[in-house]
């Protein structure tokens, strides 16, 4: 299969053997200046719940803390618990690139991530002292982000501060949308999360809009080599990286169109 429509048809054909995975920021939620004010677009929560009841696996894989995802993507606390519990296990909420997941309605961090907690705490404290005025420091528990969206002219200064702290703390630095992120040097990414969750599925879709989503595209490429039908959906924006848009099998314009696409995947009896 080559076209996006054909791959969508493969997902719809047998939901019991298919999985749908998505990024959060820029995909299910619009990009905003203050990350704490980000919320999913209208319809996103309901469509995820409907898909989770129909498909073998549905997930949101994000750089956000898993607790944030649980708070804002659960239809309500009890429904979120039901959809993420060990018995059902269909709705995967993976935060911090897989360093945290929601299990039985509770956030659980990996042992490896917990060992890096003190290092991150010290790094966050130093960065808050050293970051130039206009660059905000967001501690996420097991990662820390320097945001310069409101002052793009400070990008070089923010990079220098992030690089210095990464070297000092043995953390890995990644570049995001008008931000730099430091996280533990662990072999965990959106790609590893998707690869593990989708290993036994016959059709898999991932939707994303940023550099961090490319590892999930890589995972889908590996699954395709193993015989799975895969669909890489890129979400267009002024800040979406060219590589992601070039590799996408299907392109949509923003979170509202993402929800429309996801709604089209709900079975008629869903």
Which positions does each model-derived feature cover?
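Active-site phosphate-binding/coordination module
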Residues: 39-136
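Short, hinge-like loop/turn segments at secondary-structure boundaries
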Residues: 76-79, 109-112, 154-155, 192, ...
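Mg2+-dependent phosphoryl-transfer enzymes with acidic/Ser/Thr/Gly-rich catalytic loops
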Residues: 15, 191-270
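Hydrophobic helix-cap positions at the C-terminus of alpha-helices
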Residues: 11, 51, 76, 127-130, ...
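Conserved acidic, metal-coordinating active-site core of Asp-based
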Residues: 130, 134-220, 228-229
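The start of beta-strands in P-loop NTPase/AAA+ ATPase cores
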Residues: 18-20, 91, 204
